Amino acid sequence: MSPKESQQLVYTTQLISFLTSQYQDEIKITGANFSWKFDWNSPYLGAGATFLDNTYSIVLLGGTVRSTGSDFDVLSVTLCHEIGHILGGAPHQRFGDQLEEDWSSAEGQSDWFAASQCLPKVFQHFKEVGLINVSPSFAENSTCQKTARPLMCEWIRNASQKFSDSIYEIYIKSDGVTPRPMLSLDAPEVVQNTLVGTYPSHDNVDTVVQEY
């Protein structure tokens, strides 16, 4: 294992441990069990939330942690988003006219939970232990300067942009058509209906920006 991979494994286990301490009891209040399915040795890309046999599980494959563009910030957004599928509430995902995953929050709602509930907890804790290092100049020349918590706001915005960049590079860029989602750009369309089975073309960035 390379030094970089060792570092990735350490911060992944730290993040999983912290999120478990924050949300395990809240999930168990629903009457269900909770588990992590983290396979460091898997070369594949993948992360998700499942509900089977009265157990909520968050799946994380090692290839995701080690992928190009992934770091602690990107992993934080990824795992907070997956917890959002479990605890984010309505609206819930729907695939087709009949099949509704009434346990799983819609993609945008999961992003909202991540930005408003989970990522602030991650920022506060890991800033205190030194894994997140930000200086007062971090949020200069940013709209976050107008918020009550500019450093946290800017970290979450940057982490979310990096998350979107990684998704774009892996899954979307190859189509040669879809533009890269950017914090500095408005979505090209006005949303008329809540999307419960997918993202709009601008991905999750707009949702995160609106939280701050």
Language-model segments: what does each one mean?
Residues 14, 18, 74, 78, ...:
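Extracytoplasmic/secreted proteins, especially bacterial periplasmic and envelope-associated proteins
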Residues 62-77, 101-102:
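Short pre-active-site segment immediately N-terminal to the catalytic Zn-binding motif
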Residues 83-103, 109, 115-126:
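Catalytic Zn2+-binding segment of zinc metalloproteases
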Residues 53-60, 73-86:
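Short coil-to-beta-strand
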